[in-house]
């Protein structure tokens, strides 16, 4: 049995982009593994280890052969009538083909003859040597490098190599042996480097298996990203507990910091208490975004004047590190305090004229024009909700004013948040201030929704103005490109309508939003219908992701219910109906009715009882007349489950009708009357959902 060993590949680089590091590491490792496996060099699939640190990408793959085993290969040579003459001797065409493939003419005697398609052909079976690791590893690594998700490549030095950052060393080992090869203008070896400051000089790797322990012991580097992240998290949690504090939300920052340090150590820093007079969101953002610090909070979630530093150094006396970080953060906090103090000198109302030169979109006008649309639309929505029209209009008027404040200019992520602080500073009521802050919500999947009718009215106005505006000028999302966030806006509208819930008609809301634009501005043909179709497609995906059955969702949405808040109740009703013994037969009958009615005239009269001839059609007519008031009453009262359950009483009459009655008879009056009866039946059955969409 051929012996196997672990393969190591490491690219030693300059500092890699931190936010891209995990994906770079995972992709590089996976592609190297796939390349080895595709060439049958992996004897036993035990997966692989991925290593990604600020200055290295690496992978180890166990049980790799030095050479893949030979394999039996059968290839078609050519049709017999072309390959052999009448006496069975090789033709010149066959001899030429054999020479090109390096096959001796004597081998023809061993060729197999078999039918291939319509003609008989010659087939040659032979052993093909497997790939040698030494011959292919460099090519595999090069393929992995090319497959990395790198938007921009760079060159360095005098060579032609290109990568996301300069690469200085290449290690390729198979067990204890260096695998020869050249990648990115570098010859493979067994040398790597450790921590930039805590290790000295080059480190020689004895074996591929020794990669991680050698880097840990000699290089002072934790090369495994997940282990490094866990190490940092353990230190952060333990240190926060020692401080009697909590960390708040930290997952995204933890990922970024884990990509910035090789040997993490957590220290505690602090800043002056006076800075806590600044809104804590400002301080938190500047510490996290600019300094990569982890703010600390008390049990109530209030910011403390302490923070955690993840250093790339472990020192017996860290006082200089702590003092240096405290010194660096102070000007940042001072800037935030200055912005806050300056911004409060001017009311949000007084800032509105400064929105006039701020372009929202070159075809949709300025931010000030948009504010005027939002003010009108939010008031209209609040009126539909029988809410506080004045508060909604006022909040919408002020909603974008913080865009021209110093604080939001420095930290765009604080838009809305700072608007609330400044609105309260100006003497606005809590309801208006809260609506100013929350009108951007939900910003992402799972985000909280605005609370209260006023906040919902402003949030809906903001999103509907965006959707109607961009659909109205023909700027629709395409593929994975959505530069104006229209999918996010659509989901926000749907979530607010469903989860709050709000008794608003989506089509009416779209119409209200469209009326706010200047005449002739929205020129795209049929954009309102396009937008509603887009919204229903988003709703379809939203409901499926929530776990609703595909056919149930399709049945409800087939009727384009514009009262989105009622959709969950309709889904529940259809799900209950589907469990009834009569459901399958009624759904099948509904499908049959739909197909029959496709052949009918567009205009059909009400069914005429005098034209009913067969007992079965009379029975169906009377059953429909009897059930219809009950169904209509339940639908009017939004009791959709009872409405659908009432349909169960129609099953016997429907079954008998289709067994005994021919609909498409020659006599036109009878045919039209029976079609009219079926149309009436379909209208009754499909008030809540299109039951023909239900699967068996």
UniProtKB/Swiss-Prot annotation:
SUPFAM superfamilies (UniProt xref): HD-domain/PDEase-like (SSF109604)
Subcellular locations according to the entry: Cytoplasm
Pfam assignment, any one: DALR_1
Keyword Protein biosynthesis found: yes
Similarity comment: family membership: Belongs to the class-II aminoacyl-tRNA synthetase family.
Enzyme class: ligase
Documented EC number(s): 6.1.1.14
GO molecular function: arginine-tRNA ligase activity; ATP binding; glycine-tRNA ligase activity
Summary of subunit composition and partner proteins: Tetramer of two alpha and two beta subunits.
InterPro entries: DALR_anticod-bd, Gly-tRNA-synth_bsu, Gly-tRNA-synth_heterodimer
Cysteine disulfide links: none
A GO CC annotation given for this chain: cytosol
Name the record gives this protein: Glycine--tRNA ligase beta subunit
Originating species: Aromatoleum aromaticum (strain DSM 19018 / LMG 30748 / EbN1) (Azoarcus sp. (strain EbN1))
Annotated GO biological process: arginyl-tRNA aminoacylation; glycyl-tRNA aminoacylation
């Amino acid at each position: 049995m051929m012996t196997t060993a672990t393969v190591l590949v490491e690219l030693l680089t300059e500092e890699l982009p931190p936010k891209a590091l995990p994906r770079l590491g995972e992709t590089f490792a996976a592609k190297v593994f796939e390349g080895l496996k595709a060439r049958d060099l992996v004897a036993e699939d035990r997966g692989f280890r991925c290593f990604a640190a600020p200055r290295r990408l690496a992978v180890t793959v166990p049980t790799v052969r030095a050479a893949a085993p030979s394999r039996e290969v059968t290839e078609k040579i050519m049709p017999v009538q072309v390959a052999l003459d009448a006496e069975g001797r090789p033709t010149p065409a066959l001899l030429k083909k054999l020479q090109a493939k390096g096959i001796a003419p004597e081998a023809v005697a061993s060729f197999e003859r078999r039918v291939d398609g319509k003609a008989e052909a010659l087939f040659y079976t032979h052993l093909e040597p497997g790939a040698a690791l030494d011959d292919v590893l460099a090519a595999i690594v090069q393929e992995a490098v090319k497959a990395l998700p790198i938007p921009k490549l760079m060159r360095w030095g005098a060579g032609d190599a290109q990568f996301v950052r300069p690469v200085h060393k290449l290690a390729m080992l198979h067990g204890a042996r260096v695998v020869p090869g050249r990648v990115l203008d570098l010859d493979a070896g067994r040398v790597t480097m450790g921590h930039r400051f805590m290790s000295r000089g080059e480190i020689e790797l004895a074996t591929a298996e020794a990669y991680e322990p050698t880097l840990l012991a000699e290089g002072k580097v934790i090369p495994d990203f997940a282990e490094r992240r866990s190490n940092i998290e353990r230190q952060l949690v333990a240190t926060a507990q020692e401080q009697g504090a909590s960390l708040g939300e930290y997952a995204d920052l933890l990922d970024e910091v884990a990509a910035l340090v090789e040997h993490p150590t957590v220290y505690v820093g602090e800043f002056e208490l006076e800075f806590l007079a600044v809104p804590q969101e400002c301080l938190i953002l500047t510490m996290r975004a600019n300094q990569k610090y982890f703010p600390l909070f008390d049990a109530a979630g209030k910011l403390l004047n302490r923070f955690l530093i993840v250093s790339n150094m472990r020192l017996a006396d860290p006082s200089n590190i702590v003092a240096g970080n405290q010194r660096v953060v102070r000007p940042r906090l001072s800037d935030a305090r200055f912005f806050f103090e300056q911004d409060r000198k001017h009311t949000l109302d007084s800032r509105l004229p400064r929105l006039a030169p701020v372009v929202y979109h070159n075809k949709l006008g300025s931010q000030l024009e948009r504010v005027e649309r939002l003010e009108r639309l939010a008031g209209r929505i609040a009126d539909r909700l029988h809410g506080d029209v004045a508060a909604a209009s006022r909040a919408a008027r002020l909603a974008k004013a913080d865009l021209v404040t110093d604080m939001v200019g420095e930290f765009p992520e604080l838009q809305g948040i700072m608007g609330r602080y400044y609105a309260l500073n100006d003497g606005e009521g809590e309801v208006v201030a809260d609506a100013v802050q929350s009108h951007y919500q939900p910003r992402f999947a799972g985000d909280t929704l605005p609370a209260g009718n006023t906040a919902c009215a402003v949030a809906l106005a903001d999103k509907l103005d965006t959707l109607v505006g961009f659909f109205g000028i023909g700027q629709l999302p395409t593929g994975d490109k959505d530069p104006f966030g229209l999918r996010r806006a659509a989901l926000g509208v749907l979530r607010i309508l469903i989860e709050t819930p709000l008794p608003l008609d989506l089509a009416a809301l779209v119409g209200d939003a469209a009326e706010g634009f200047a005449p002739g501005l929205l020129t795209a043909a049929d954009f309102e219908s396009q937008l509603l179709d887009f919204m229903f497609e988003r709703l379809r995906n939203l409901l499926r992701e929530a776990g609703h059955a595909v056919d149930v969702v399709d049945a409800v949405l087939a009727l384009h219910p514009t009262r989105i808040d009622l959709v969950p109740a309709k889904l529940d009703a259809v799900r209950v109906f589907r469990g009834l013994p009569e459901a399958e037969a009624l759904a099948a009958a509904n499908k049959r009715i739909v197909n029959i009615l496709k052949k009918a005239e567009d205009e059909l009269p009400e069914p005429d009882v005098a034209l009913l001839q067969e007992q079965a059609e009379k029975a169906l007519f009377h059953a429909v007349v009897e059930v219809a008031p009950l169904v209509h009453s339940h639908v009017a009262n939004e009791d959709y489950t009872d409405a659908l359950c009432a349909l169960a009483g129609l099953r016997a009459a429907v079954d008998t009708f289709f067994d005994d009655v021919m609909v498409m008879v020659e006599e036109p009056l009878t045919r039209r009357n029976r079609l009219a009866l079926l149309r009436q039946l379909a209208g009754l059955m499909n008030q809540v959902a299109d039951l023909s969409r239900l699967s068996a």
